[in-house]
Structure formats: structure tokens, C-alpha cells
């Protein structure tokens, strides 16, 4: 031991266990523009004060450990430690608190969502002093945002590539999701694209199974794309799922898609992982491919209100990691999604600058400093009667994706696509004429049925279908 170390240790080191709040709860701290800010929903164990719980989160997700260690004296903890700088009670919840934590930027590797999450949502979520812990929101500072490429292309570049403006894009997930041969799969793709859809999609668990290997699927889907483009005069695409068991295999599939000349590939970003996703996003930008992102596994992480991570955080992470589309719920369909909360993270996906708005679950003002935006995808249990609400809720910069709502049409796949396209065009025209889609939506659809027997048949099939279940993850203060 050197004399310098020995002297410092003799006056500054005291072995033992300290309360976290002595070092990591700093209500006087003024946050910096370069700090990453986090809002955690903390549920302390009985007998643990909220200040101690918040400080424990700050410590265990940054520089702290359970006891004082000698090597604390070899660095500047004041420079590197996370700080719990504010705690507030959650309305209507006696045992829950929002703990705000500031992290110095130097704690994180540049351009790495993987490293950021390993710290902020790592081992701390298993900490015994906490009964539950949920990350509600993150503020990503411009200094860190600028280290990421972000989406391969973004909303405006995608519209320019497709030459489609002034309306939402239309998609369809091919069903049944598993079991079709590659040729029959390609036939369904062709029929949907010919009928008027912009995109069709591999389901998230379509990779390369014995009944349909990936290369065969890619070839038949490419044939469907080119044939439908020739017949309609519109640019078409199919989300070819490149997700695979290894990053090398994923890239092989993306390269083959590029060689086929198709416009877009797909990745399951949570099951595939952020490192793989960021690599694929970089490849897509370099090679002119759009990237569709599916969020399979998200509800394991985000559905419970008191533990895990809200989807708005996963949405921000995806915008950093890279993707041109991401599934975002529907509000009106079969999947979980509170309206105000959904609109909040939809804005976080699309807009350059989003103000703090607790009524929509947004805890921090977020400045994306020109990072390209991501198109939200509404998908899951939607049909033609939902079209006015979807158009009103999501606006033009979105993808409305109907699986069963296309392929379940009584006359077949192409008429199902026609019905959706007619319904969308009717809603966009009515909106542009100043009509209120929220009030007149059903009337607008009925009027369009007079000119489209395909739409009339679809309306008859799905007139009674609803998904009336309460939302589990509501915003605080809602009954």
C-alpha cells in the first residue's frame, strides 16, 4: 500500500454498513442538462422510509453496494454517483412513491441502450428492501441522444420512399401466424397487397420453422410484392422478419432481403435484444432498408402498474436503438392500452420535442434534437368499424394494421383489403372535409358501404365485435 493510499484510508475509511440516504438522497441537488433523469415508482418494504428506498435505488443502479468498500477512496463518488433528488407520494396509494433519480452522463457508454438499461433497470429490481419497483419514465439528454443513430430513416424519408402522403399507411399480419407453407403464405401476401394495402407482415414468431424456412418465405413474398406493384402501380412492402437465434444469422437474412430489392425488414427488438437491434438498424440505414419493429414480450415488462417498466421507456429506448415502425397498441382493439398514456408515448415516438405532461404520463420534457421519428403501429383486434377512431386517435403518421380484420373477410383476402382501404379513404376524406370522426364515424362508414360491397360485407361480419375490458395500467388518479 502506498503512503498516499494509507494516509487517505486512515482518515476517510470506516468499515461497516451505512444508510443509503446518507450519501444518495440529496434533495438539494440541482439537476444538470447532461444528466439522465429517471422517475421510479417505488414500493418500499414495511418499515423502510421512502427516502431510504429512493436512495437505495440511486445507489444500487449507479456506484453503490451494500457496504462501504476501500476502493471508494480511489475515485470521486460525488462525480459518478446517482442521486435521488426528489420523492413524492402517488395519489391514492399509501405505500407507493415516485422517486426521481439523476445519473451523471459519464456512467454510460455512448450509443448503447444495452449499457444504459443494464445500470438503470438491472439488479436493483431484485433489491430486497423494495416490495416492487417500476421505471415510469426517462429523460434522455441531448448530449446522450446525439451519440445514437436512431431510426434508420424516419417518417418523412419513409413517405418519400413509398411516395405515399396525407393518410395513415395500411398493413395486415398474415394469419394463421404459424403453419402455412411458403407458397400459400406468399399467395396471401399478394392478395392483400393487390387489394389495396401498403404492407403485409410476418407475425412476430415467424422465423424459420420446419413448415416454412425463411429463404423460401422471402422468395415467395418478394414475388408477391413485385406482382402486386405491377398490377396496382403502388409501392408495396412485406415486413420480412429477420429475427434469428444469432446476430450473424439475423444479418444474413437482412442481407438476402436487400439482395431481393424489397423495401423493409422486421425485428423483434425485445426478444432479439438491443445490441442486435442497433446493429440491424445501422445496416438498414447503410443499405436503404426500412425497419419494422415488433414489441413481443413487452407486456411481461410493462403491464403491471407497480413493477417493471412502462412502455414509454421501451419506446424511447427503441427510438434510440433504431426502428422506423413500432407496435404501440390500439386503444380500441383487443390489447391493453390506456388512451391518454398511449397518446403520450406516441408523441414521444414521433415528435422532435415533447413537453412534460403528467396527464398523459410524461414525467419529463424530452428534446430529441432532430433524431428521426418512428411511426406507431396500431395492431391487434381491429376491424373496419374501428377505422374512424383509429384515424382520429393516431392521425396520418401511423400504420393501421389489420390481421383478422383483413383475412377474416367472408369473400377472401383481397376483398378484405379492399374493405379496409375504402374505409380508410372514406375517413380521411371526411376528416379533410371537416367532419368529426369521433361523432360521425359510424355514419361515415355506412355511407361508404353504399359504394363498396366489400366494405358492406365486412361491416356486417364485425358489427357486434367489441373488447370491453378495463385497462389494468391506468394513469394515477383515474378510477
Curated annotation (Swiss-Prot):
The disulfide bond which can form in the large chain dimeric partners within the hexadecamer appears to be associated with oxidative stress and protein turnover. Binds 1 Mg(2+) ion per subunit. It catalyses: 2 (2R)-3-phosphoglycerate + 2 H(+) = D-ribulose 1,5-bisphosphate + CO2 + H2O; D-ribulose 1,5-bisphosphate + O2 = 2-phosphoglycolate + (2R)-3-phosphoglycerate + 2 H(+). The record marks 334 as: Transition state stabilizer. The basic functional RuBisCO is composed of a large chain homodimer in a 'head-to-tail' conformation. In form I RuBisCO this homodimer is arranged in a barrel-like tetramer with the small subunits forming a tetrameric 'cap' on each end of the 'barrel'. Belongs to the RuBisCO large chain family. Type I subfamily. This is Ribulose bisphosphate carboxylase large chain. It comes from Brassica oleracea (Wild cabbage). The gene is rbcL.
